[in-house]
Amino acid sequence: MGQKVCAHGFRVGPTLIKGWDSILYAEKHYKTLFIQDLKIRDLINKGFNQAQISRVLIERPSNKSIIININAKKPNIIIGRNGSEIDKLKKAIEKMTSLKEVYINIHEVRKFNIDAAIVAQTIALQLEKRVSFRKAMKTAIQASFKQGGQGIRVSCSGRLGGAEIARTEWYIEGRMPLHTLRADIDYSTAEAITTYGVIGVKVWIYKGEYTENKRYN
């Protein structure tokens, strides 16, 4: 089971280590709000792809307000000069949701080498710049262990190196207990758009076992 399902979704729950990316309560309008959340994430991820966004957490404490927390490696790109970019984003979300109370919080990810989303995006960017996939994967593994990672697994799929036949290459270092629910495993994917086609990147990072002070929502 742990080998097949998404490592993040497998651990989502009030008593487990992972939390939901959307926090809201709606009886009749759940579908509408859910689609809105998807559009907001799409707007942020596509508009600020150079910022290397790790996570977008959307909270709706009431029917009149929305709080968006963005974790990114380069928060200055999202903020912009004198806050110009974040003001544009706020106005776009106000128009999309028809809410006047829109709050956006930007958080910098300091240990980005053990953040699966940022690591996957970094590998994808290197592949787009024609860096060897083996070099990109090995560099990511070494950097992860330097920042406290206890295990990492990286997979690249597609026409690697411009080969005629698509294949999958992967590397694994350290521990990766996918079946252990208390294991803090971060998982993410990314896509590299190359001249040979799309290359898919998957990253699993094991940060240690769950403890109460490590839990986040």
From Swiss-Prot:
The keyword Ribosomal protein applies. One of its GO terms (biological process) is translation. The keyword Acyltransferase does not apply. One of its GO terms (cellular component) is cytosolic small ribosomal subunit. Residues 40-110 form the KH type-2 domain. InterPro entries: KH_dom, KH_dom-like_a/b, KH_dom_type_2, KH_sf_prok-type, Ribosomal_S3_C_sf, Ribosomal_uS3_bac-typ, Ribosomal_uS3_C, Ribosomal_uS3_CS. PROSITE patterns: KH_TYPE_2 (PS50823), RIBOSOMAL_S3 (PS00548). GO terms for molecular function: mRNA binding; rRNA binding; structural constituent of ribosome. SUPFAM superfamilies: Prokaryotic type KH domain (KH-domain type II) (SSF54814), Ribosomal protein S3 C-terminal domain (SSF54821). It comes from the Bacteria. Keywords: Ribonucleoprotein, Ribosomal protein, RNA-binding, rRNA-binding. Belongs to the universal ribosomal protein uS3 family. Binds the lower part of the 30S subunit head. Binds mRNA in the 70S ribosome, positioning it for translation. PANTHER family: 30S/40S RIBOSOMAL PROTEIN S3 (PTHR11760), SMALL RIBOSOMAL SUBUNIT PROTEIN US3C (PTHR11760:SF19). This is Small ribosomal subunit protein uS3. The lineage of its organism: Bacteria, Pseudomonadati, Pseudomonadota, Alphaproteobacteria, Rickettsiales.
